[in-house]
Amino acid sequence: MITRRLALLCSTAVLAGASSALAQTRRTPVAPPHPAASRPRREAAPTGSPADTPLGPVDTAARWAYIQDFDTGASLLEKGADEEVPPSSMTKLMTMYIVYERLKQGRMKLEDELPVTERAWRMGGSKMFVQVGSTVKVEDLIRGVIVQSGNDACIVFAEAISGSEEQFAELMNEKAKQIGLVHTHFRNSTGWPDPEQKMSVRDIATLAGRIIRDHPEFYHYDSETSFKYNGIDQANRNPMVQKGTADGLKTGHTDAGGYGLVASAIRNGRRIILVLNGMASMRERAEESERLMDWAFANFEDVTLFTAGDIIERVPVWLGTAPTVPLVSGRSLMVTMPRNWRQRASVKVAFATPVKAPVAKGDVLGKLTLAGQGVPAMEVPLLAGADVPKLGLPGRAMAVLSHYVPGS
């Protein structure tokens, strides 16, 4: 077994003797696409225990926090990420996920009119102000939920889809299991206070990511800054959407859970999902979400170590029709790294040599390992990039003879 270390040079990682470049990185200077990004840098607001990050502890005013890279799924910051806590109006993400799924399946249309019951009309909290006995277009209800955080609009959807909000909550729980939410339980469609209504901030981030990934054709509603219905114009409650520093998703507040927010932003082609909960005020929520979103973009980058089919090394073949076989990656590999990752990362390839013919394209011949402080540890199989048939009998005889006879 031979093990070789990759040398990480500039924007590529090159194995001595290898011909292909590895590790092309996004090197564009990170800058938010909005003038608000030029605001003075905020210092951390230390409150309680700090959050865990690959770079070490980071203070945050949030009681619960989770930040994730959308493309790689890498966890950039965690604080109580799996604790089951009141999700407040961030619950509405699941209501909308189910609505979007119905629309995509053709079981509901944007122009459909849904009836408003007295229960929906009487619902307290944040409202779209639908009128009892009327009907409302699905598209208006979507904006009523996302922009205005309308509890009444959620009830209209729940009753239209499942007959009652109680039955709709059962559907929400089924969907939560299907998409991998493990610290979530729903009792209603709105996030109205209920001691059994729980979500972890990691689950909220997962749900937000599924909305963006599974239903991109509907995600544009999240970036709308206001919506007027029934003569009442209401602004989007998400402070980051209002400032143009995020393109979604939802805020929330309950007495038990405090002020929360799930937001997503894309800068220079890289998307981050941030979830904070348990803050003391709207102002603290706005400032902390901006600060930590900036921190995530400033301190990490997405690095493509290699793409599918890249030749990592050439391995000698014994008794084959070709002297070597290319060792290739079976898939593209992009990871999220600290920005000084070249000083932290250790990348090695290991393979047995020589390989005995015949070799079939796709055979696993070695592995690549990635490790280092703050670097996600992983192991990737390396595959034969071509078929190498076995030599015929005369060829094998000559190869054996040349191997054992000096000077031949």
Where are these regions (language model features)?
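N-terminal secretory signal peptides and thylakoid transit peptides that target proteins
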Residues: 1-12
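Catalytic-site microenvironment of enzymes
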Residues: 6, 76, 407-408
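Phosphate-coordinating loops and pocket residues in cytosolic domains that bind phosphorylated ligands
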Residues: 9-10, 143, 223
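N-terminal pre-domains immediately preceding structured catalytic cores
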Residues: 14, 31-35, 401, 406-408
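Hydrophobic core
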Residues: 14-16, 368
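Boundary at the C-terminal end of the N-terminal hydrophobic targeting segment
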Residues: 21-23
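Active-site-adjacent loops and short helices of periplasmic peptidoglycan-processing enzymes
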Residues: 25-202, 208-214, 227
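Domain-terminus/edge residues, biased toward the C-terminal soluble/receptor-binding domains
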Residues: 182-185, 193-408
